[in-house]
């Protein structure tokens, strides 16, 4: 049995806590909202985020971050990407022994263009962390919480640590694969949200299955092109951390990114959509960061650019689709496998 802290009592943090508790581990879940923490401890539910999922009674929750970390050897950091830096700073002030840190967020910091593990490494002193890993893949918390079969990847440069995390989480409903390509895992998880937003938008526009299939296929090509340019293994984009994550995020109404894109496609304004969602839509931040990164790296990302124009430049979705359809003609396999071109 391991002593585990889960930082973040949202839908995904709660679902990860459930998997760990099912496997017999001692789980202490940290949340900022006293109301949610009290409900977890008294009713063993977290109805704001996972309304149909009773939780194991062994899961305990607290609003005291120091208490959550005390005596814990593994820390799962399950907060929005925008909170990774401030929360990591807090952890650095409170950690007294080195711990394994596994983050389960998907994003890129817009101002610095840093991946989330890079931010964690900056903010938490080396003496206070044993290793940094990322848990990512095609997972909806709503399905994990009711124990539907799910597969996911733990990516870590230290495969011995990854193996430990794999053992912690794996059970009959939750299968974990190993990957040493942290760069590819993080870029796959972050950049696919851009394509998922665009997929929701095509559905909202009523363009049908043909357009959505084309968007997803060409979308994985362009996010892989950027990821490989920035140091990722191209194989990661054909696995759970790439195409797998894209499929689940771009095709399901569980997906916040799909729902946000769908609403925009139906004519709603971005600010209204974000206000009504009540939860983070990571694809918006990812689009802003990727648009800038692509310019710096000299990588062509036409779908990302089109989405950026809609979200941040006020352009018409219909007009941007027309521009995509009338781009110069080319061979389909151009730059699909030869990413360096």
Swiss-Prot record:
Residue sites binding NADPH per the record: 11-12, 32, 106, 141, 256, 280, 282
Domain of life: Bacteria
Catalytic activity: sn-glycerol 3-phosphate + NAD(+) = dihydroxyacetone phosphate + NADH + H(+); sn-glycerol 3-phosphate + NADP(+) = dihydroxyacetone phosphate + NADPH + H(+)
GO biological process: carbohydrate metabolic process; glycerol-3-phosphate biosynthetic process; glycerol-3-phosphate catabolic process; glycerophospholipid metabolic process; phospholipid biosynthetic process
GO MF term set: glycerol-3-phosphate dehydrogenase [NAD(P)+] activity; NAD binding
Pfam families per the UniProt record, alphabetical: NAD_Gly3P_dh_C, NAD_Gly3P_dh_N
Compartment annotation: Cytoplasm
Key words of the record: Cytoplasm, Lipid biosynthesis, Lipid metabolism, NAD, NADP, Nucleotide-binding, Oxidoreductase, Phospholipid biosynthesis, Phospholipid metabolism
NCBIfam families tied to this protein: PRK00094.1-2, PRK00094.1-3, PRK00094.1-4
This protein's name: Glycerol-3-phosphate dehydrogenase [NAD(P)+]
Species whose genome carries this gene: Exiguobacterium sp. (strain ATCC BAA-1283 / AT1b)
Gene field: gpsA
């Amino acid at each position: 049995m391991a002593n585990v802290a889960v930082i973040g009592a949202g839908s995904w943090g709660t679902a990860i806590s459930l998997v760990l508790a099912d496997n017999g581990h001692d789980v202490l879940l940290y949340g900022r909202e006293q109301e949610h923490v009290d409900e977890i401890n008294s009713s063993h539910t977290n109805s704001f985020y996972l309304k149909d999922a009773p939780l194991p009674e062994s899961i305990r929750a607290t609003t005291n971050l120091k208490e959550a970390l005390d005596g814990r050897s593994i820390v799962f950091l399950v907060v929005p990407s925008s909170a990774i830096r401030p929360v990591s700073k807090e952890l650095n002030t409170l950690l007294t022994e080195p711990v394994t840190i596994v983050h389960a967020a998907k994003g890129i910091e817009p101002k610095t263009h840093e991946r989330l593990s890079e931010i964690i490494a900056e903010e938490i002193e080396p003496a206070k962390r044993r290793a940094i890993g990322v848990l990512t893949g095609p997972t909806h918390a709503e399905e994990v919480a009711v124990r539907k079969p799910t597969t996911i990847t733990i990516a870590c440069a230290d495969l011995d640590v990854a193996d430990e995390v794999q053992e912690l989480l794996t059970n009959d409903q939750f299968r974990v694969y190993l990957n040493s390509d942290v760069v590819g895992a993080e870029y796959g998880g972050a950049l696919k949200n851009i394509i998922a937003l665009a997929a929701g938008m095509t559905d909202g526009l009523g363009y049908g299955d043909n357009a959505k299939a084309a968007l997803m296929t060409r979308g994985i090509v362009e996010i892989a092109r950027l990821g490989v340019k920035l140091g990722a293994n191209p194989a990661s984009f054909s696995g759970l951390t790439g195409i797998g994550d894209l499929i689940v995020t771009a095709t399901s109404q569980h997906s916040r990114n799909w729902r946000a894109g769908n609403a925009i496609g139906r004519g709603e304004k971005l600010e209204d959509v974000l206000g009504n969602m009540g939860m983070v839509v990571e694809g918006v931040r990812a689009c802003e960061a990727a648009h800038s990164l692509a310019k710096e790296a000299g990588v062509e990302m036409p779908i990302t650019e089109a989405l950026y124009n809609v979200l941040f430049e006020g352009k018409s979705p219909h007009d941007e689709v027309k521009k995509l359809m009338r781009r110069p003609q080319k061979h389909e396999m151009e730059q699909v496998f030869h990413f360096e071109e």
